[in-house]
Amino acid sequence: MNHGKKTFLLALASAVVLSGCSGSGQQMTAYDAQYLDYFDTVTSITIYAKNEAEFEQYKSLAEDTMKKYHELFDIYDNYDGVSNIKTINDNAGIAPVTVDPELISLLEFSRQEYEKTGGRVNVAMGSVLSIWHEYREAGLKDPSRAQIPDMQKLQQAAQHTDLEQVQIDPQASTVYLPDQEMSLDVGAIAKGYATKRLAETLEEAGVTSALLSLGGNVETIGTKADGKPWRV
């Protein structure tokens, strides 16, 4: 989700030597794929399949799923036909935004995490995090001028981080930020949520054995084809 930068895909798929039999006795082979263009991190998937053709079907589904969540949760870029986190932020103080039900689900989950962590996980911290991002990028561009943000500036931004103000309407599938200075940043939970949903999607499609890692957020499906547990 790098602002102003093109994303690129590195998909490396190969059958590894390890293989095994499923519970039905079907010979299964582990296939791998790695990507660099989702969530600004390394994504790797290992899926046991009967053959390469079956793996390609699962891989295509995984790519479509990761692309969907990458675009929905992006705070920097717009995508044709997609109302994402950036769309919500751009309409702060203007109007509710109709979004994909998955965004409603993510934001409702974020409220649960907010309560569970006593407010330490707060997706409404976008106004503060954007300042840190701005200073970090400036420091990377010119290390000799790197500095931390002014405390007063951060404190002012912190006045616009009340998660309770975020208006979520599940029935209408809309999200609205009434405070025009507020913005959402779901980076703290997006990758974990997307990894979990990816696992659920692949399992529903018939995958019985897989290891999925999205930036270190790991989910497994079943065991290895030989019955041994995945080592994470």
PLM feature spans:
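N-terminal low-complexity, intrinsically disordered patches enriched in charged
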Residues: 49, 197, 224-225
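Cysteine-centered nucleophilic/redox motifs
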Residues: 179, 188-214, 219-220
